[in-house]
Design a protein with these regions (language model features):
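Generic preference for hydrophobic
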Residues: 27, 58-60, 146
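Rossmann-like NAD(P)(H) cofactor-binding subdomain of soluble oxidoreductases
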Residues: 50-135
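Short, well-ordered alpha-helices that flank and scaffold nucleotide-derived cofactor binding pockets
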Residues: 17-21, 85-89, 112, 278, ...
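NAD(P)-dependent Rossmann-like dehydrogenase/reductase catalytic/cofactor-binding core
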Residues: 170, 221-307
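NAD(P)+-binding Rossmann beta1-loop-alpha1 motif at the extreme N-terminus of oxidoreductases
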Residues: 1-51
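Internal alpha-helical scaffold of NAD(P)-dependent oxidoreductase catalytic cores
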Residues: 89-90, 112-118, 131-240
Length: 307
């Protein structure tokens, strides 16, 4: 299977590097200096005291036109439309598009480039950080889940192809499953990303602060309740009180942790808030629901991006 990974950052290199043991992998990026280092040195993945290096071809965006069986997206969520447009030569009639990015709503954009039977969404609990342009550390292990994003009544992906892809992930060292209700899995992860994670970014505090400060936690509870309400209309049913307990436990288990949206705001970078809180707001509006706290947090994030 030919798998093309767009976005050779920490996660893109992790998945591309490990999948290369079981598939024909190509990397696509936009930083010429980093791509040169990857082509020269290969991709090195470290885990504990062990490491493995694999040679994987890396190309500048728009310069590779070899049709892929699967395109795995690891860019920022707001870059999806641009990177797929720039690399449309990679997309054939049978190419499957798969995203494991944070947030929700990516499939709305991806479906501008492929039909419902070829758009996959998912989540992963793998973790990775970069030591250099071509060296990453696999910092967290966990399951990867993906499935078809087709709406009710639309044709979904070929189950045999999904199983083939799952087996490749498994053989590459990624615990993996195919979900029959992937939107539930996506909303389950969004429960943390669109509540405590985004709030830590707005307040510029570590995760533990939110769990212990009464004012911060009350805001977080409101965000969680609004997520549950919006998710229900998408067929993902959650008990708000259970989710409130789950999120608080998550924060207390990693009190000194900082989120990616915290880092983006701190360093003056554009965030993925439109695919996190924005996904909740869009889903709520389509159902005629009001989610004022999510809307306010989203506006605050954008206001801070403009500093």
């Amino acid at each position: 299977m030919k798998i093309t990974v767009i976005g050779p950052g920490a996660m893109g290199l992790l998945f591309g590097g490990k999948l290369a043991a079981c598939a024909d992998v190509t990397l696509i990026g936009s930083n010429a200096v980093n791509l040169k280092e990857i082509n020269t040195n290969g991709v090195t993945i470290k885990r504990g005291d062990s490491s493995v290096t694999r040679k994987i071809p890396a190309y500048m965006a728009g310069t590779c036109n070899e049709t892929a069986d699967v395109i795995l997206l690891f860019t920022k969520a707001y870059q999806i439309a641009d990177v797929l447009t720039e690399n449309k030569g990679l997309i054939g009639p049978d190419t499957m598009l798969l995203t494991l990015q944070n947030g929700a709503g990516h499939d709305r954009v991806m479906r501008e480039f492929a039909d419902s039977a070829h758009v996959l969404i998912g989540t992963t609990k793998q973790g990775s950080y970069r030591e250099s342009a071509s060296v990453i550390v696999n910092s967290g292990l966990g399951e990867t889940v993906f499935g078809g994003a087709a709406a009710k009544g639309e044709p979904g992906p070929d189950k045999a192809r999904l199983e083939e892809l799952r087996e490749i992930f498994e053989n590459a060292g990624f615990p993996c499953s195919v979900s029959e209700n992937i939107r539930f899995d996506v909303w389950n992860k969004l429960m943390i990303n669109a509540s405590s994670s985004v709030l830590s970014g707005v307040l510029q505090v570590p995760q533990g602060y939110i769990a212990e400060d009464s004012y911060a936690w009350s805001i977080c509870e409101d965000l969680i309740r609004e997520i549950c309400a919006a998710a229900a209309g998408e067929g993902a049913i959650f008990a708000p009180e259970e989710q409130i307990l789950r999120v608080r436990e998550h924060l207390r288990n990693a009190p000194d942790g900082y989120t990616s949206i915290y880092a983006d705001i701190k360093n003056g970078r554009k965030t993925e808030a439109d695919f996190i809180c924005g996904a909740v707001v869009r889903a709520a509006k389509e159902q005629g629901l009001s989610v004022p706290v999510q809307e306010t947090i989203l506006r605050l994030v954008h206001a801070m991006e403009g500093r």
